[in-house]
Every structure is written in structure tokens, then in C-alpha cells.
Swiss-Prot record:
Presence of keyword Transferase: yes
Gene: CHS
Name of the protein described by the UniProt record: Chalcone synthase
Protein's job: The primary product of this enzyme is 4,2',4',6'-tetrahydroxychalcone (also termed naringenin-chalcone or chalcone) which can under specific conditions spontaneously isomerize into naringenin.
One Gene Ontology MF term: naringenin-chalcone synthase activity
Active site: 165
Reactions this protein catalyses: (E)-4-coumaroyl-CoA + 3 malonyl-CoA + 3 H(+) = 2',4,4',6'-tetrahydroxychalcone + 3 CO2 + 4 CoA
Domain of life: Eukaryota
Family named by the database record: Belongs to the thiolase-like superfamily. Chalcone/stilbene synthases family.
EC number: 2.3.1.74
Enzyme class of the recorded protein, top EC level: transferase
CDD domains: CHS_like (cd00831)
Pathway: Secondary metabolite biosynthesis; flavonoid biosynthesis
Taxonomic lineage: Eukaryota, Viridiplantae, Streptophyta, Embryophyta, Tracheophyta
Organism: Persea americana (Avocado)
GO BP: any one term: flavonoid biosynthetic process
Length: 392
């Protein structure tokens, strides 16, 4: 007689899911944030806005902590479009024609980096999780990536469109379940974002759009997530201990995105930083109370910054190091679902050995336990508990 429980036991991994490798990539086109308002954004002959709007946008760029933004849209391409139609009115078809092709292409660039870090051939990859806020299509970017990267046609795929800035946590939550419930699985997670679907010129009637234009750039990131690493071959960076998602109370309409003929439009309320500050400790308590941890200053933090106000609303709930870790990505523009992965990658890079950080004993910059946060439409919060591993 077949024993279902015995079958399930064989199918499941023995240990926790781990982040085994990370790869990141950005488009070659880079723009200094200090030059972006005058020379790139307001340089269009169709951009006639009030001086107050210009000053507001410059102030947003200055406070963003971003030093350089990477963009698929080059200045030449952007100005050529502006000769015919303001970017506020650029039709969805034109945006889709760009991102449907370029999102999988940018995603393809990061896969070899992640697979090299895993130390296993790409034939070990299964399943594939692809996430993007940039465009929608059928078959999706997961299908296109499978074809261009030469993955087996039998690879299990999951496509996530239109999730927003919390999705960096979502993909880890899903990858954790996939890795722990499928023995031997090596989950390839790819996030690829190109802001052509949201990019538009200034408008005096849509001032909340300026926030997204000031913050978001383009980039792609890939992770390999798996359990029971092969000794001497795979060297995991973090263990994924737990993962949760919640919708914050009284947050309806705080962050919205709507796909319209003019592309993906953003609507942000000023109360977002306050809502997160007010509720973030509850998420921390729920995640860390089972571990006996209540000192948030003892954790390393990885979060989607979404602008400095998100993690520094004037409160005591977040530690200075949280803002510092997020700043590693903010220096190179914020990229929706990929942001948290970029920060994870920067942790790994620093632990590998610049003189300043020599001697760090864990992948969490010497700290054992950490938290990864994602904030986005809903207002939705993803919380992932990370356990760092020895660097040697």
C-alpha cells in the first residue's frame, strides 16, 4: 500500500530555504541625479510647467539620496519621442512595444551571474519565478526568458506582473515555499524593471506622479534559492526563516497604480511614511517574537527605501543602519521589485572584503539576524526574516 505521508517526506527538503547566489544588472545608459531635472526631465520643449512644480521636482531629486540613475530610455530616444507627443500622452502600445522585448532581455543578463555564483550548471534550475511591473503580455516574460536562456521546456514557471515595490519580498516568500516543498529544487528568481511604462513628462495636475519620476530607475536582479546546499559546491548567503504579508489598516488608496492608455500611472498619498512608521513595529513583533528577539537595533535591515521619508519619518522605529543599507541601492536609483535584491547583493560584496569591512564574521555584516521589508500598493508590507551565515 502506498503511504502518502512517506511520499511527501521524500518530496520535501530537510533544511530551510537559502539564498545561494545573486546577480544584478543595469542598462548602460546612466544619468546623474543632479542633472536629471534640468537636462533630462524639463529639457523637453513640451514641458511647460509652473516654476513651483520645477522647484518641487528638484527638491525631490535632491532629497532622494540618489546619485546616479540607470535608464533604458536614452536622452536621444526621449527627445525624439517628445518631438511628436508629450510623454504624458505617449500611448500604451508604444510603451508595450519597448518593455515586452527589453524586460526579458535585461533579465537574461543577470542569470549567468547568479548561476555562476551557485556553482551548478543551469540544467539544475527548476522552477523559474519572473517578476516585473513593466508591461503585460501572453505568453509572458517568463516564457521569453525560458526560450532565450535555453532552459528546458519542462521548467516550471510562475509569472508575476503588476505587483509593485513590495514584490522583492513576495518573490522570496514564494521561492522559500517552492524550495522547501520540492527536494532538490533550485529556484531561479528574476526581477526586471524598465520604467518606460511609467515614464512621462511633468503635469501640473498630476503632481504625485513627480515622486515616481524622481525615484525610479531601471535594473534587473536574479537569485538562486534552494535548500540543503551541496557541501563544497554551493555557498549560501542567507537562510530564509519565515515570510509574511499584510495589508496595513486604514491604507486604502495610499499607493495605487493604474494601467491606462497613457501607461502605468502612480497615485501616492503623503500619509504613506506615517502609515508605515505607525505599523512597522507590529510586523517586527509578529516576525521575531517566536525567536525571542525584541531589540530591533540588533538586526540588519534590508528594505525598499521608496524615498528617505519611508524609513526616516522622524521616528525611532528604524535604526540608522537601516537607512544606510537602503542607501546602497538609493545611490544607484530605486528599481521597484529589484531594490531589495540589490541591497542583498551589496551586503555580499562588502562582506567579501574591502579593507573597511575585513573581519566581518557573517553575511549580515557581522550581525546574525535580519529583516527584509517590501512596501507597495495596498498598502502592502512583505516581511522576510533572514538568518546570516558565517563568511568563512
Amino acid at each position: 500500500m502506498v503511504n502518502v505521508e512517506a511520499i511527501r517526506k521524500v518530496q520535501r527538503a530537510e533544511g530551510p530555504a537559502t539564498i545561494m547566489a545573486i546577480g544584478t544588472s543595469t542598462p548602460p545608459n546612466a544619468v546623474d541625479q543632479s542633472e536629471y531635472p534640468d537636462y533630462y526631465y524639463f529639457g523637453s520643449p513640451t514641458a511647460s510647467t509652473r516654476p513651483s512644480s520645477r522647484r518641487s521636482f528638484k527638491r525631490m531629486c535632491e532629497k532622494s539620496m540618489i546619485k546616479k540613475r540607470y535608464m533604458y530610455l536614452t536622452e536621444t530616444y526621449w527627445k525624439r519621442i517628445q518631438m511628436f507627443v508629450p510623454t504624458w500622452l505617449l500611448p500604451l502600445k508604444a510603451r508595450q512595444d519597448m518593455v515586452v522585448v527589453e524586460v526579458p532581455k535585461l533579465g537574461k543578463e543577470v542569470q549567468p551571474k547568479a548561476i555562476k555564483g551557485m556553482g551548478q550548471p543551469k540544467s539544475k534550475i527548476n522552477p523559474l519565478v519572473f517578476c516585473t511591473t513593466s508591461g503585460v503580455d501572453m505568453p509572458g516574460a517568463d516564457y521569453q526568458l525560458t526560450k532565450v536562456f535555453g532552459l528546458p521546456p519542462s521548467v516550471k514557471r510562475l509569472m508575476m506582473y503588476q505587483q509593485g515595490c513590495f514584490a522583492g519580498g513576495t518573490v522570496l516568500r514564494l521561492a522559500k515555499d517552492l524550495a522547501e516543498n520540492n527536494k532538490g529544487a533550485r529556484v531561479l528568481v528574476v526581477c526586471s524593471e524598465i520604467t518606460a511604462v511609467t515614464f512621462r513628462g511633468p503635469s501640473d495636475t498630476h503632481l504625485d506622479s513627480l515622486v515616481g519620476q524622481a525615484l525610479f530607475g531601471d535594473g534587473a536582479a536574479a537569485l538562486i534559492v534552494g535548500a540543503d546546499p551541496v557541501p563544497g559546491v554551493e555557498n549560501p548567503m542567507f537562510e530564509l526563516v519565515s515570510a509574511g504579508q499584510t495589508i496595513l489598516p486604514d491604507s486604502d488608496g495610499a499607493i495605487d497604480g493604474h494601467l491606462r492608455e497613457v501607461g502605468l500611472t502612480f497615485h501616492l498619498l503623503k500619509v504613506v511614511p506615517g502609515l508605515i512608521s505607525k505599523n512597522i513595529e507590529k510586523s517586527l513583533v509578529e516576525a521575531f517574537e517566536p525567536l525571542g528577539i525584541s531589540d530591533w537595533n540588533s538586526l540588519f535591515w534590508i528594505a525598499h527605501p521608496g524615498g528617505p521619508a519611508i524609513l526616516d519619518p522622524g521616528g525611532d522605529q528604524t535604526r540608522p543602519e537601516a537607512r544606510e543599507s537602503c542607501g546602497n541601492q538609493a545611490c544607484f536609483s530605486v528599481s521597484m521589485a529589484t531594490c531589495q535584491v540589490f541591497v542583498c547583493s551589496s551586503f555580499s560584496t562588502r562582506c567579501e572584503g574591502s579593507p573597511k569591512e575585513e573581519g566581518l564574521k557573517t553575511t549580515g555584516e557581522g550581525i546574525e539576524w535580519g529583516v527584509l521589508f517590501g512596501f507597495g500598493p495596498g498598502l502592502t508590507v512583505e516581511t522576510v526574516v533572514l538568518h546570516s551565515l558565517p563568511t568563512h
